[in-house]
A protein has these predicted regions:
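Short acidic, glycine/proline-enriched loop segments that cap or flank alpha-helices
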Residues: 59-63, 67, 87-90
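Core structural elements
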Residues: 64-76
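Conserved short "hinge" loops at termini or chain/domain junctions
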Residues: 1-64, 108-123
């Protein structure tokens, strides 16, 4: 797992950021910050009392994979925004669009199926 995070590993975050990132964007202490920000966003999206990070051990493997994908791309969103000038504008915007679309899909899934998702995860 990422040194400071629970829902995604450093490797997953770096993969989501992609090639061409600058040294600060792939620095471990920065990816630690971005995963914590992503986890905070996800906790807020689920609402109080769910405790994604606190109850991580009880979540099923399939949902852990889903959460890792969302968390790593949300963290990548912060990393890419840290210095979007690492890429040509079109590339940076494309990367941000992918991350943002995954986040919007996650929020939409929660809006429509939150109770079912929480129950299926065993929370």
């Amino acid at each position: 797992m990422a040194a400071a995070g629970t829902l995604a590993t450093d490797a997953q975050i770096l993969l989501a950021i992609g090639a061409g990132a600058n040294a600060e964007q792939i620095l471990g202490t920065n990816t630690d910050i971005w995963i914590l920000m992503a986890e905070s966003d996800m906790e807020k999206a689920f609402g109080g009392g769910v405790g994604l990070v606190a109850n991580y051990a009880s979540i099923t493997a399939a949902y852990k994979q889903w959460l890792a994908m969302i968390a790593s791309h949300r963290a990548a969103f912060y990393g890419i925004n840290y210095n979007p000038n690492s890429w040509q504008l079109a590339t940076a915007q494309s990367k941000l669009n992918v991350c943002n679309n995954l986040w919007k899909g996650f929020l939409s899934d929660l809006k429509e199926h939150k109770a079912d998702i929480i129950a299926d995860m065993g929370l």
